[in-house]
C-alpha cells in the first residue's frame, strides 16, 4: 500500500486527537445494535438484550476501547500493517472463528462515529484517507482466512 504524506498526516491526526474512551464504546455498540448477528461473538459479555443494555455494557465499552488501541498499532506501523495484525488475524480466524465480514461492518461503524465527532472537519479527503486506512487493516485481519 502506498501512503501519501497527506494521507499519513490525516490518519495520524485523527488518532492523535481521538478520544478512545468515547469513540470505541460508541462504535462497537453501534455495530452490535445495527448488525445484531455480530453479537454471537460477544456472548461472554453479559446482557446484550437491547440497545440500552449494549450501550451500558462495561465489557462492550472496554472492548471498543481495546479495538481502537489495536488500530493505533496500525497507525504506528503503516508501512507494515499486514505483519502488525498477523497474530490478531490468526486469533480471530482460528480460535474465535469471527466472520471476516464483521471487520468491515465494525470499520464502517467506526467511520460513522468518528465522522459524527469530527463534524465539518471530516471532509471528503479526510474520509478517503481514514477509510483507506481501515480497509487496509480489515484486509490484514482477513489475511488468515485466505
UniProtKB/Swiss-Prot annotation:
GO MF term set: haptoglobin binding; heme binding; metal ion binding; organic acid binding; oxygen binding; oxygen carrier activity; peroxidase activity
Tissues of expression: Red blood cells.
Alphabetically ordered keywords of this record: Heme, Iron, Metal-binding, Oxygen transport, Transport
Domain Globin, chain residue ranges per copy: 2-146
InterPro entries: Globin, Globin-like_sf, Globin/Proto, Hemoglobin_b, Hemoglobin_oxygen_transport
CDD domains xrefs: Hb-beta-like
UniProt cross-references to PROSITE patterns, sorted A to Z: GLOBIN (PS01033)
Domain of life where this protein originates: Eukaryota
Listed GO CC annotations: blood microparticle; haptoglobin-hemoglobin complex; hemoglobin complex
SUPFAM superfamilies for the chain: Globin-like
Any Pfam family: Globin
Keyword Phosphoprotein recorded: no
Residues binding heme b: 63, 92
GO biological process: hydrogen peroxide catabolic process
Record-stated family: Belongs to the globin family.
Additional remark text: This fish has 2 hemoglobins: Hb1 (major) and the minor Hb2 which constitutes about 5% of the total.
Function: Involved in oxygen transport from gills to the various peripheral tissues.
Subunit structure: Hb1 is a heterotetramer of two alpha chains and two beta-1 chains.
Name of this chain's protein: Hemoglobin subunit beta-1
Species this protein is from: Dissostichus eleginoides
The encoding gene: hbb1
Amino acid at each position: 500500500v502506498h501512503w501519501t504524506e497527506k494521507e499519513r498526516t490525516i490518519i495520524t491526526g485523527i488518532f492523535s486527537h481521538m478520544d478512545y474512551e468515547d469513540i470505541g464504546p460508541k462504535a462497537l455498540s453501534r455495530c452490535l445494535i445495527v448488525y445484531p448477528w455480530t453479537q454471537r461473538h460477544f456472548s461472554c459479555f453479559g446482557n446484550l438484550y437491547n440497545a440500552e443494555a449494549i450501550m451500558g455494557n462495561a465489557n462492550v465499552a472496554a472492548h471498543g476501547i481495546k479495538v481502537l488501541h489495536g488500530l493505533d498499532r496500525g497507525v504506528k506501523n503503516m508501512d507494515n500493517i499486514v505483519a502488525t495484525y498477523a497474530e490478531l488475524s490468526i486469533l480471530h480466524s482460528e480460535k474465535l472463528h469471527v466472520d471476516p465480514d464483521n471487520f468491515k461492518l465494525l470499520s464502517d461503524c467506526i467511520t460513522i462515529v468518528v465522522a459524527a465527532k469530527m463534524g465539518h472537519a471530516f471532509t471528503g479527503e479526510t474520509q478517503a484517507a481514514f477509510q483507506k486506512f481501515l480497509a487496509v487493516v480489515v484486509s490484514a485481519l482477513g489475511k488468515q482466512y485466505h
